[in-house]
Regions:
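Divalent metal-dependent hydrolysis catalytic cores, especially in the metallo-beta-lactamase
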Residues: 47-83, 99-105, 123-131, 155-157
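Short, acidic/polar
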Residues: 56-65, 108-118, 141-143, 198-199
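Hydrophobic alpha-helical segments and helix pairs
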Residues: 111-160
Length: 304
């Protein structure tokens, strides 16, 4: 971390630099479909409008973790602390030897040429965050315009929203064009029943809109039971994987920004996977086929 460039927030939990080796061996070609890079701040400064200042988490550290956990590829999601400055993201993709794709954050002012540059760099989608403690949420007409402009590129939307806000936003989400992927199952309240009103609404949204996918990631953010097993999250993620096996993905969320209760062991997060995707077929769809279809379709469609 460059102290001269910035100072990470007091109380910030830094990522585990010595994660365990997972007991679960992921299938060949597995993809970590949700991870981030932060800075380094002295090279890629954090946005002046950021709501938090993290520790540095470099591309080299991310790629080392990928290899340690047994994954082959990564989908790097633009962190809100970098705003719409995607340089750290693009740099990481450029140094991945073709093993990474990206999800950018863009403003309404972005030009068509700039979108094409991001596409050439390996970006395949745009993230919209509706979590007010992390971002200033943009007006719906701005988001709709961006969503429409990325369709010719074949990009998709990534939606970060929390379950309590879903009732007010579901109609808007259903109006947006193209494929969209919800982060972390829209962050359900795992103290409620898996067939309760709140989670059922999310499941109905997926059932009614075949263009909607979700990541069954971040048990560490949702749990009250705690690590390493995250038993209270398992029923929710398992239900989603079983009902929507072709529209689910998984990711580490490394380096786990804004955690307050604990810092997860990434090896133990991988061991969560066979508890929610209980067969070889479900595991392959979750970790290989589904993210390949979305991020490397040119390889998936031409594969054996």
């Amino acid at each position: 971390m460059s102290e001269a460039a910035f100072q990470m927030d007091n109380g910030w939990l830094e990522f585990n630099s010595d994660p365990s080796v997972p007991d679960f061996k992921v299938p060949a070609g597995a993809i970590d479909a949700h991870c981030h890079v932060f800075g380094p701040g002295d090279v890629f400064p954090y946005a002046p409008t950021r709501k938090y200042t993290p520790c540095d988490a470099s591309k080299d550290q991310l790629f080392a973790l990928r290899d340690h956990l047994g994954f082959e590829r990564s989908v790097i999601v633009q962190a809100t602390c970098h705003g719409a400055d995607n340089r750290a993201l693009v740099d990481a993709i450029a140094h991945s030897d073709g093993k990474a794709r990206g999800i950018a954050t863009v403003s309404r002012a972005i030009s068509d040429d700039e979108l094409l540059e991001l596409d050439s760099a390996g970006v395949r989608g745009v993230r919209f965050s509706f979590v007010k403690r992390l971002v200033d949420v943009l007006p719906h007409d701005t988001l709709t315009e961006v969503a429409e402009r990325i369709q010719p590129l074949g990009w998709h939307l990534v939606i970060y929203v929390e379950s309590q806000d879903l009732p007010d936003l579901s109609e808007f989400f259903a109006s947006l064009p193209g494929t969209m992927v919800f982060d972390h199952m829209a962050r359900p309240d795992v103290t409620q029943a898996i067939n309760g009103k709140a989670f059922d609404q999310f499941m109905r949204l997926l059932a009614d809109n075949e263009n909607m996918w979700t990541k069954v990631s971040c048990p560490d953010r949702l749990t009250l039971a705690g690590p390493p097993r995250y038993d209270d999250v398992v029923p929710f993620a398992k239900r989603v994987v079983e009902i929507f096996p072709d529209r689910t993905m998984w990711g580490t969320d490394w380096p786990h920004p804004n955690m307050t209760s604990h810092m997860p062991d990434d090896g133990k997060l991988v061991d969560f996977i066979p508890r929610i995707a209980v067969s070889d077929e479900l595991q392959r769809k979750l970790l290989v086929d589904n993210p390949m279809r979305l991020y490397w379709p040119e390889e998936f469609n031409n594969g054996p």
